[in-house]
Amino acid sequence: MKKIIALALALVMLASLAACGGSGSGKYKVGICQLVQHPALDAATQGFQDALTKQLGDKVEFDVQNASGEPTNCTTIINGFVSSKVDLIMANATPALQAAASATDTIPILGTSVTDYASALELDNWNGTVGGNISGTSDLAPLDGQAAMIQELFPDAKTVGILYCSSEANSQYQVDVITGYLTEMGFTVTPYSFTDTNDVASVTQKACDSAVIYIPTDNTAASNTEAIANVVLPAKVPVVAGEAGICQGCGVATLSISYYDLGYATGLMAAKVLTGEAKISEMPVQYAPEFTKQYNEANCAALGVTVPADYSPLEG
């Protein structure tokens, strides 16, 4: 009888260790690949870690890696996660998600700060669920609302230049959609794309031919707001931004989500996947429930832009 009890206890202990991941430490091992360091992605990563820590406490350990804006680095980082057999991968931004999707079809992958999963993963017949080992959250803001913001703040403007990185699939998606809305409103829309950080300033200078510039949620732009500001502010050309971080750096106004809250929601999803409460293959992509009209006080003052009373000043 004692042998039977001892065997049963041993099996329980083994099952417990297995349930807490494959790290050998009795903890779930989570690899985080963040494309680049800038306020939006930083906030999403922090929110993710905070949520998962609140749900699982010390049963989770994080390996946080930054790709320094290079998609090839995402591939290297993700391959390292796969080799170390992490229990879950959090891919922060579209290139990180694409690298993870190419590297494994068994380890659960949760994306965040990804605008459009269908275009990022080249999915047909998109129904809101990726399936397989992938799900996550989207940072897609209401592009119709952002177009309406441009019209509200600059009713006399005739031309809008859209400034973005052509190598980011999420940016191209937003450009295509908002161009349709702006054209319907009567604006003449011109896209101005840069390929990397080296030509941000020169392309921004060309975009200043427009009355207003719009910048979508774009990681390269978010990492180069100072360079953009150094061009648009002296030229007296206002920028409406797709998210708060870009607006803080070079814009006048934004209709933005909270990237911290988005990351937090992703962390809650991760907890359910790790504990077996939910199957990732059945989890639909989640979207931010709230959007906030915000403005940059300093830039608005410098450019003489007046915003309605329902806009909130950006913090920091």
PLM regions and their residue ranges:
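Pocket-lining segment of extracytoplasmic ligand-binding domains
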Residues: A169-V237, E243
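Flexible loop/turn connectors
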Residues: G245-A298
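Short beta-strand elements in bilobed, periplasmic/extracellular small-molecule ligand-binding domains
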Residues: K54-C74, N133, T179-T197
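Hydrophobic alpha-helical segments within soluble ligand-binding/sensing domains
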Residues: Y117-T159, I257-A278
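An alpha-beta-alpha
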Residues: V30-I32, F48, S135-L182, K279-C300
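Beta-alpha junction/loop-to-helix N-cap segments that form part of ligand/metal-binding clefts
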Residues: D63-D124, D218-G242
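Extracytoplasmic "Venus flytrap"
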Residues: K29-Q49, Q55-G57, D63-N73, S171, ...
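Short, low-complexity disordered leader/linker segments with a strong preference
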Residues: M1-K29, K54-G57
